Amino acid sequence: MSEDQDLGITQSKIHNTGEWYAEVVQKAELANYGPEGMSGFIVTRPRAYGLWERVQSYLDTRFKQTGVQNAYFPLFIPEGYLEREKEIVEGFDPEVAWVEQAGRNELEERLAVRPTSESIIAPYLSQWIRSYRDLPLRVNQWTSVVRWEATETKPFFRTKEFLWQEGHTAHATRADAWAETMLRLNQYESTYEDLLAIPVLQGAKPEHDKFPGADTTTTVEALMPDGKSVQGATSHYLGTEFADAFDITYTDTDETSRVAHTTSWGLSWRALGALIMTHSDNQGLVLPPTVAPEQVVIVPIWQTETKERVLEYAEDVANNLDDAGIRVELDDRDDQNPGFKFNEWELKGVPLRAEIGPDEATEGTVTLIHRPDGESITAERSEIVETVQEQFDAVYAKLYAAAEETLNSNIRIAETRSELLGTIGQHGGYVKTPWCGDEGCETAIKDEIAAEIVMVPISSDEDDEQDTTDENMGVNNDTTVESNEKSLDLTDSTCVVCDNPAFKTAYFAKSY
């Protein structure tokens, strides 16, 4: 096999999506699979970690602007801590990795390797909170968690260990905690839409699929080109259950002891999986300029007699872009031809290529090529910074528009069971259906076609009824605040599975 053949992508995104994805991840130098005997673990290479750092920077800035402070809590959680919240134990027990021995000595109490941190953070919130003056309290940690999932692993989508952030807050009232829940959900939506060029749907998880111990789990869902949904991030209103279990109380203005309302919210490197899957093509990785390690690659094209002049011009352009804060790479290697360089940088996903040959050097121009579609733009040297920045916006808009078209054209409605099964089987995507709210009806569809309810819409019907003083009333999954996804008209509707009256709109989809 020649070097050019080895460099390129050999699988088809449309026909062999799984193999194509794995090939892009490895050949674009994003990750390697872990050591033999450690199925489900990956080695994150610098290019992928750089993507994660840009996601981290984007979110961390917004968290801090809205009162969040970073902290770090232990990797290990005593078994007794987990057992204090029954639903956490039941929800995560099959996925928990346990430490039972240190050196040659058996531990007195097993330690869970962090699957999530509510049970180790809540006891400290209890210590730190004494009065209403200590509220709201907001902490976040950037860390990794381990969930020993039995399902097939896929780099960045499903791995036993993964990077994420998890935020945890405590509030005096249900209304404040719910506002926090939605604030973080909106920040996650912005991360996908304004940083990663991926449109998402906002909704809530059905009652049986919410986070263990949560009152309400909200979600942003992204649709991949193969018609499967990705849970992009979740934000949980935990009510008072965790606060009751861990004694998170505060003294109110009237000296009354009250139970706090808590939230937790997280986004993992699954966002990178969605980024890779959404935009990349059969030539390799495609990245928006917002997160690309190199936003522009300059490829000089010369003959022996023009080399010095072309390189001098290219270096001047590179310095100009670098001074403007643009991430630029000048590929002046002389052991590879321009065609090889074009293919290599396309594979690595650089959004904009600048070609500079003798003609450009003579005429005072730069030829700019868009990575997504190969569109060519001639830029004046004197306006190169402004033009490059304009082309960044153009590339981002192209990527978002393509992803938005995929999403909008793949939301369908089914009013019968046969329509639901046929639509998912033929098209994939999201199928909106009337649903009675019974988990058994979802299970029947899941058993037949491996599709599940990924979300139900959030509406504003009962938002005004949120009581800021009632500590025990939960938030209804369907009727809390406005969302960008609307319910079907369920007047006289029946569930597509059991024909009982329908009370909810369910979004069915296959998912990662």
Swiss-Prot record:
<dbReference type="InterPro" id="IPR045864">
    <property type="entry name" value="aa-tRNA-synth_II/BPL/LPL"/>
</dbReference>
<dbReference type="Pfam" id="PF00587">
    <property type="entry name" value="tRNA-synt_2b"/>
</dbReference>
<dbReference type="InterPro" id="IPR004499">
    <property type="entry name" value="Pro-tRNA-ligase_IIa_arc-type"/>
</dbReference>
<dbReference type="InterPro" id="IPR033721">
    <property type="entry name" value="ProRS_core_arch_euk"/>
</dbReference>
<dbReference type="InterPro" id="IPR006195">
    <property type="entry name" value="aa-tRNA-synth_II"/>
</dbReference>
<comment type="subunit">
    <text>Homodimer.</text>
</comment>
<dbReference type="GO" id="GO:0017101">
    <property type="term" value="C:aminoacyl-tRNA synthetase multienzyme complex"/>
</dbReference>
<dbReference type="Pfam" id="PF03129">
    <property type="entry name" value="HGTP_anticodon"/>
</dbReference>
<feature type="compositionally biased region" description="Acidic residues">
    <location>
        <begin position="460"/>
        <end position="470"/>
    </location>
</feature>
<feature type="region of interest" description="Disordered">
    <location>
        <begin position="460"/>
        <end position="484"/>
    </location>
</feature>
<keyword id="KW-0030">Aminoacyl-tRNA synthetase</keyword>
<dbReference type="InterPro" id="IPR004154">
    <property type="entry name" value="Anticodon-bd"/>
</dbReference>
<keyword id="KW-0648">Protein biosynthesis</keyword>
<dbReference type="Pfam" id="PF09180">
    <property type="entry name" value="ProRS-C_1"/>
</dbReference>
<dbReference type="InterPro" id="IPR016061">
    <property type="entry name" value="Pro-tRNA_ligase_II_C"/>
</dbReference>
<dbReference type="InterPro" id="IPR017449">
    <property type="entry name" value="Pro-tRNA_synth_II"/>
</dbReference>
<dbReference type="GO" id="GO:0006433">
    <property type="term" value="P:prolyl-tRNA aminoacylation"/>
</dbReference>
<keyword id="KW-0067">ATP-binding</keyword>
<protein>
    <recommendedName>
        <fullName>Proline--tRNA ligase</fullName>
        <ecNumber>6.1.1.15</ecNumber>
    </recommendedName>
</protein>
<dbReference type="GO" id="GO:0005737">
    <property type="term" value="C:cytoplasm"/>
</dbReference>
<dbReference type="InterPro" id="IPR002314">
    <property type="entry name" value="aa-tRNA-synt_IIb"/>
</dbReference>
<dbReference type="GO" id="GO:0004827">
    <property type="term" value="F:proline-tRNA ligase activity"/>
</dbReference>
<comment type="similarity">
    <text>Belongs to the class-II aminoacyl-tRNA synthetase family. ProS type 3 subfamily.</text>
</comment>
<keyword id="KW-0963">Cytoplasm</keyword>
<dbReference type="GO" id="GO:0005524">
    <property type="term" value="F:ATP binding"/>
</dbReference>
<comment type="function">
    <text>Catalyzes the attachment of proline to tRNA(Pro) in a two-step reaction: proline is first activated by ATP to form Pro-AMP and then transferred to the acceptor end of tRNA(Pro).</text>
</comment>
<keyword id="KW-0436">Ligase</keyword>
<keyword id="KW-0547">Nucleotide-binding</keyword>
<dbReference type="InterPro" id="IPR002316">
    <property type="entry name" value="Pro-tRNA-ligase_IIa"/>
</dbReference>
<dbReference type="InterPro" id="IPR036621">
    <property type="entry name" value="Anticodon-bd_dom_sf"/>
</dbReference>
